[in-house]
């Protein structure tokens, strides 16, 4: 079924035109299989998701063995030659929802999700402090400043701060795959 994909359980489908898109459909799922791991168990006190969000196969292989890392570099740190400081490092596999569940929930009300659309996961956090995924969590709502090289502290981002996000797939028995990095710098309001 090269060049064509169907959404499970529904009437909608999309057709991919061109050899590049058709090749991508066949390539990405096979490459991604080595990254797929079991979804972590939900806390016993949490309710069972609705049937359209629950699939045993997705629970068995719906999470990804991807490590994410977030670093912070202030203008003062860059001027002094300091390396960015790591704020957080944690597993994407600890997400509460799988990618399939996010897509199902996004489209259940009729939203026409298309190939190439970006879908945000929200903050990725785990139980321990070093895996918290936001400055709000790390600074305990601004009450606990994060100490940086050169005596600076942060509870929230400031003008000139640069965030670096990195990710790589790591799983025993498989090669590590790096996804590169994404950088963003806070510019002063005009």
What are the roles of these predicted feature ranges?
Residues 3, 8-10, 18-114, 120, ...:
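Catalytic-core "active-site belt" of small-molecule-metabolizing enzymes
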């Amino acid at each position: 079924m090269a060049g064509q994909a169907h959404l499970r359980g529904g009437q909608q489908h999309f057709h991919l035109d061109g050899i590049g898109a058709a090749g991508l459909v066949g390539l990405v799922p096979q490459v991604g299989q080595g990254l797929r791991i079991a979804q972590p168990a939900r806390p016993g006190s949490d309710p069972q998701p609705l049937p359209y969000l629950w699939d045993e196969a997705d629970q068995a292989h719906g999470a990804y063995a991807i490590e994410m890392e977030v670093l912070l570099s202030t203008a003062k740190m860059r001027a002094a030659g300091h390396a960015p400081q790591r704020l957080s490092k944690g597993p994407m596999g600890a997400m509460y929802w799988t990618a399939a569940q996010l897509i199902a929930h996004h489209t259940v009300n009729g939203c026409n999700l298309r190939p190439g659309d970006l879908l945000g996961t929200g903050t990725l956090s785990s139980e321990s402090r070093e895996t918290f995924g936001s400055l709000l969590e790390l600074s305990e709502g601004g009450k606990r400043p994060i100490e940086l090289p050169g005596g600076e502290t942060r509870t929230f981002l400031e003008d000139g701060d640069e965030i670096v996000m990195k990710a790589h797939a790591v799983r025993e028995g498989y090669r590590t795959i790096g996804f590169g990095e994404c950088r963003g710098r806070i510019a002063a309001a005009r």
